[in-house]
Amino acid sequence: MDRSRSSRAASSNQFIRPCGLLTTVILLQTLVSMSLAIEEMSPPPAAPPRPSPPPTVKLNKCCHSGEYLNDGTCIAGSEALWLPMVYLVQQQRFFEPHGASPRFLKFLPNTRPTCRKDQTTEIFRSRGANVMLFPNGTLYVRERALMVQPSDYCVDWEVAVVCLNDSQPINALEDPDYAANPLVQQEPPKASLRLSKCCGKWGSYNTQLQNCDLQPNHQAAVDGLLRLSPQLPEGSYQTSYGLPDCGQPGGYSIAGDWQDAKLDRNTAMLQLPHKNLSAGQYCLEHTQREGEVKIIACQHLFSSAAGAGIHDGSIGGTIEQANGQNLQKAVLTGGILVSIVFLSATLVAGFLLPAVHHALHWRCQICYVTCLLFGKILLAIEELSSSLQPGSAACHTLAITMQFFFLAAFFWLNTMCFNIWWTFRDFRPSSLERNQEALRRYLYSLYAWGGPLLITFVAACVDQLPETTLLRPGFGQLYCWFDNRNLSIFAYFYGPIGLLLCANIALFVSTTHQLTCGLWKRDDVKSSSEKSALGRVCLKLVVVMGVTWIADILSWLVGGPHGVWFFTDLINALQGVFIFIVVGCQPQVWTACRRIFCPRLRHDITNTTNGVQHSSSSQGLPSMAGGTEITQNTTTTTTTTNTTATHMPSNPAEDEVPEKAPIAPVAPIVKMETIC
């Protein structure tokens, strides 16, 4: 019975469940249909009321209709859209089109404010929203962060004439306490020096985003003023607000650090390394780093600035000075291009002599010329390319790559100078085994490639750190080079190069001393022709060891007008020409060229050269070692063969030096070649 009772209960439950679900669905459908019917019968909600137009406000126009204000004088002719920008507070937008007048603004023509005795008249430019109007007629001057009543100003095309009180109220838009207590007064300093803060009263410059950060900055959160101590004590200057009026497209750039600049307190002119900025051409701004202040200026002022070793002149010069600077820049750029051609020819000349490719000095020479060639090419691209913009990835990459190749060139130059000095250090016979020469080659490569790579890697890593007290190189910020800060460019470029050049000069002095005081006094060198040839060797060493590069370091350290260093800059720009004269203008090179381009002469040249001189040492390199054939195996055995064929000397100095009787090879015989 229990089992039958339970079975009946289960069957009844199975029947009740679907019936209950069906009933629920029917009820829901009924409720939905009733709610839709009610919504259709109810009237639509009322639209929000349109904001009532503001009351009519009368403002002063400085000149008559159809006239505009220019240097305090009304001149016929005006623009249709002449009004400063009007900000509609309720709609939170500017009235469009910009320059047009809303209907609620009425203007009294040819009406200027009457300033009281305790007021001064000042004219403000309205470009870049420096001046804007509010619907109640209040004028906001962003440059001074102040509000002006309609009776104290007049407006015209791109200008506003304002009567300024001795003490102006704090900006109501930017100071939250002003709304609660509008009687708060801001006492400006009495100093006449006025410096502009770029990003407004409470903003700062974000170096990562490369724009203004309008969030309150901890350095300006107190009063929104510039903090320029210890260079300028507080109270010795006034703070205005806004970016400079460029007048040309192109935006703004970081011109440098405030700590590296010199300020003329009388004129507010700012002197940067090789650049002067007048008071209206720059502004200052704090960054997120404690104590750091950047100088921001119009980018077009630096569009012609140079990269490594080439400096721009002052902006505030005459037209003749500007033309002279442009001419000097064009000449130097042309010198760089000419140097590129001759450096390429030098590489070709070096590869025309496969017999000397094993020489260690030849390898150092080729690496030096190659690095200098690539550095010059990148510098020419930076000078001539108009598509490279500071801040771009291409500009950043170009700056890092150019630093590496220039550093590598000077490291290889130092290696080559050491190799020259090592060869001439005591004029004693020295022979290197093949494994010893290979070891020196590996050590040279490790030093000359590893040093620049390490310096460039450290500079690139420091430049990408978000927060650090280390010196940032600032690649690609202002130029496609360093950001023109003295300490950073010294630490990562001029400092290492200066040390290498000092070492090169010491090696040059030691080498020339060995040539003049050592070889000159030997019995081998007595005639005046031999001594003059030896003097030409020393002259070539000046080019080889990069002695003239020291002038580029001095021009950076001393500074001054660009014309003072024009001659030395031109010599360094044409360095490739001088290197080609020393290396490419060798008789062996011309002989190789004739052998390649004149096949009929190959047989004659081979016959004549086979009967002249044979040496057990490696063939000398027509290198930059002052025209001297530098070999590592200097112990030689020389035999002379008389030939009836045309004499083709392997050493052109033999045409100058009188023939001598053979002497015992106690010391190496230094063969000198004449300059081209």
Curated annotation (Swiss-Prot):
- List all Low complexity biased stretches: 631-646
Major location, coarse class?
A: membrane
Q: How does it sit in the membrane?
A: Multi-pass membrane protein
S-S bridge residues: C198-C283, C199-C212, C246-C298
UniProt topological domain (Extracellular) ranges: 38-335, 387-403, 463-488, 562
- Spans through the membrane: 336-356, 366-386, 404-424, 442-462, 489-509, 541-561, 563-583
Region (Disordered) location: 609-658
Where found, per UniProt? Answer: Cell membrane
Task: Read off the InterPro entries from this record.
Answer: GPCR_2-like_7TM, GPCR_2_secretin-like, GPCR_Mth-like, Methusela_ecto_dom_2
| Keyword line | Cell membrane, Disulfide bond, G-protein coupled receptor, Glycoprotein, Membrane, Receptor, Signal, Transducer, Transmembrane, Transmembrane helix
State which ranges are Cytoplasmic (membrane side). Answer: 357-365, 425-441, 510-540, 584-676
GO BP terms in the entry: actin-mediated cell contraction; cell surface receptor signaling pathway; determination of adult lifespan; G protein-coupled receptor signaling pathway; gastrulation; imaginal disc-derived wing morphogenesis; mesectoderm development; mesoderm migration involved in gastrulation
Q: Spell out the molecular function terms from Gene Ontology.
A: G protein-coupled receptor activity
Q: List the glycosylation sites.
A: N136, N165, N276, N486
May I have one GO cellular component term?
A: plasma membrane
Q: Which residues lie in Polar residues bias regions? A: 609-621
Q: Where in the sequence is the signal peptide annotated? A: 1-37
Give the UniProt family note: Belongs to the G-protein coupled receptor 2 family. Mth subfamily.
The protein depicted here goes by the name: Probable G-protein coupled receptor Mth-like 1
Species in which this protein is naturally found: Drosophila melanogaster (Fruit fly)
Q: What is the lineage of its organism?
A: Eukaryota, Metazoa, Ecdysozoa, Arthropoda, Hexapoda
